[in-house]
């Protein structure tokens, strides 16, 4: 009787203090299960987001001077000529300047667009898991998304290193600069739909998805099998939408050239 009473009143061991941002970054790479449990217990957003943004702008600073914007404008001019052969050289030159200017501005705003994407991802994931009986808060979901994004940070660092080594990069071929997905096996102009589809099966994207599954299971208190079903279903929907847009663009280009 006394042993039972002693056991019921035994003090619980205190939880370890939460890891800092850099410990968590290392943890999601080498010990994701325990790290995402720590993130779910005490999520953080500001420091990892700022760190990713700083790295993103360093990459942008190094990449922008190496972007071959002429290749982008030439491709657009080719499409415009096919649709409007009567356009003058002055008009085409104006389109070329606008295209290059827009590309440069968009490139500098790219890291900031990432914030919007992370917020959308966190909101969609939280809604999906709550609808399927899971738990969690928006802060937990956003923190999970940010730390799951680390493989993509590594990817952009690798892309930047390759770009610096090459000297010039065609922005329209960014997804195949690093041969981490099978899209490089097909020609983007001849098979745009297949190119778009294959580009989704990137090693770094799959790595991110695995981390998302582990992290979402931790904050939502669901099984990893259920988390995998939800995350992969949402990913499949995104692939379908992206492929549909590629198909519409390809059909539009086909109409222009016929």
Predicted regions and their residues:
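Hydrophobic alpha-helical transmembrane segments and adjacent short intramembrane/lumenal linkers
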Residues: 139-255
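Coil-to-alpha-helix initiation sites in intrinsically disordered, low-complexity, charged segments
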Residues: 16-27, 96, 192-193
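A generic alpha-helix surface/boundary motif
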Residues: 30, 122-126, 209-211
